[in-house]
């Protein structure tokens, strides 16, 4: 259990056999996978990207859908496009973002991760913190320029130089609203478009969620819940 003593201005950490007092507490319990709200279970054909190498699926002749427009989604897209797990029949890449955005690698972006900036950040009020976190999102959630260029070049070569029939769909600006089983043992992915609010459905034999991770607040931090962002 972790509490904060306002009078002493320090944390009180209670364990099964000892009590510690500290000015700072570092929590290193990791994160858990993040899945869309409409996804309640995983299977061999519908799973989080973190399990890709464990499941090692055969995608030959399959309709494949990737959900998630960040770096892991880009890495998956490029490797599947190149036939790492066999040549798929179709490859869809669905993202909530309006574009496949580049990682913010500007010269001063790394200043956000320096001790001085962190100290000044924690002196802000909650509203300012939320605003700054949203503004800085692409410093961690974007796609490297190298990955985007590799995807562009690979697609250009296959579809514009070699003139292959288009078997890839880039589908930004869409939120996944439902994943349903179909009678032909496939999945139907239902989405809502952010710009025109239209509803669309896409079929896939294999669905991979490159939707990242989320922090799980442990029970022992419950006394500090009102202090956490």
Residues covered by each model-derived region:
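Flavin (primarily FAD) cofactor-binding/catalytic cores of flavoenzymes
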Residues: 1-71, 75-229
